[in-house]
């Protein structure tokens, strides 16, 4: 159910960018994983191992976003508008 929700966005990004190592592609993948895990926590609030994994993914995504913000602010703003996420925590 949730898995099918995120696949179209990934396939859309794959068509636009053929490079799975690009910062935008990695951020999209991390964002999809984060959304899946947050929906998982609604059913399993005491799954502490998954919470640890979520914190690691959040840190990696934050690092990639700060890198992208330093390198190319226009690409960063475009990505944030596509993902509908807030950028208040980016350093």
Curated annotation (Swiss-Prot):
Name-wise, this protein is: Small ribosomal subunit protein uS15c
Organism this protein belongs to? Cicer arietinum (Chickpea)
**Its Gene Ontology molecular function terms?**
structural constituent of ribosome
UniProt lineage: Eukaryota, Viridiplantae, Streptophyta, Embryophyta, Tracheophyta
- One GO cellular component term: ribonucleoprotein complex
Against Pfam families, the record matches this protein to: Ribosomal_S15
Q: Sorted alphabetically, which keywords does the UniProt record give?
A: Chloroplast, Plastid, Ribonucleoprotein, Ribosomal protein
Q: Decide whether keyword Ligase is in the record.
A: no
Family membership noted in the UniProt record: Belongs to the universal ribosomal protein uS15 family.
UniProt xrefs under HAMAP family: Ribosomal_uS15_B (MF_01343_B)
Identify the coding gene: rps15
Q: Does the keyword Ribosomal protein apply?
A: yes
Q: Give GO BP annotations, semicolon-separated.
A: translation
Where in the cell?
Plastid, Chloroplast
């Amino acid at each position: 159910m949730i898995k099918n929700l995120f696949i179209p966005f990934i396939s859309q990004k794959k068509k636009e960018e053929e490079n799975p190592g690009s910062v935008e592609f990695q951020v999209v993948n991390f964002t999809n994983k984060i959304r899946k895990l947050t929906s998982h926590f609604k059913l399993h609030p005491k799954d502490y191992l998954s919470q640890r994994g979520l914190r690691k993914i959040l840190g990696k995504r934050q690092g990639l976003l700060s890198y992208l913000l330093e390198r190319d602010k226009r690409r960063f703003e475009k990505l944030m508008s596509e993902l509908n996420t807030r950028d208040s925590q980016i350093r």
